[in-house]
């Protein structure tokens, strides 16, 4: 791979990492842009240390989406049970629903922190010119 091509792909990866960080300020609406960018240029980096960054970002995206959806579904299910318990005057259901909603929110929070950690770790490795594991 030529130096110009490697430099271009390095800048491209900096942009995608940046877009992932910016997506936190757009309620995740920009998440789709860097993942499309990663899939578009992924094969251009085959056989280089830069390919690890494309794979790292793609895996980070998909695992984050799956766990975020799981957390949201658990929370929504629990809050629905909480609403039913208010109508039925059942304290046990209310306590269980509150605990389950807390568990769902814990999953969402952990996913948020894990995603941010992976973006920061990957971006630091890219800046240092190293592959990510």
Regions found by a protein language model. Give the residues of each.
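Alpha-helical transmembrane segments of integral membrane proteins
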Residues: 11-14, 18, 29, 59, ...
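Hydrophobic alpha-helical transmembrane segments in multi-pass membrane proteins
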Residues: 60-75
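Hydrophobic alpha-helical segments
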Residues: 31-37, 65, 78, 82-85
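Membrane-helix interface segments in multi-pass membrane proteins
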Residues: 3-6, 71-109
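Membrane-interface extramembranous regions at the lipid-water interface
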Residues: 1-26, 30-62, 117-133
């Amino acid at each position: 791979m030529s130096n110009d091509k490697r430099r271009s792909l390095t800048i491209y990866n900096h942009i995608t990492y940046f877009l992932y960080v910016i997506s936190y300020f757009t309620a995740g609406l920009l998440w789709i842009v860097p993942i499309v960018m990663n899939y578009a240029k992924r094969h251009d980096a085959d056989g280089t240390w830069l390919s690890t960054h494309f794979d790292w970002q793609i895996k980070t995206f998909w695992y984050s989406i799956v766990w975020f959806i799981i957390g949201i579904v658990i929370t929504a299910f629990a809050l629905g049970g909480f609403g039913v318990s208010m109508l039925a005057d059942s304290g046990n259901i209310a306590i269980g629903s509150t605990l389950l909603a807390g568990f769902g929110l814990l999953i969402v929070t952990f996913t948020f922190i894990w995603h941010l950690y992976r973006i920061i770790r990957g971006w630091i490795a890219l800046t240092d010119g190293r592959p990510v594991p």
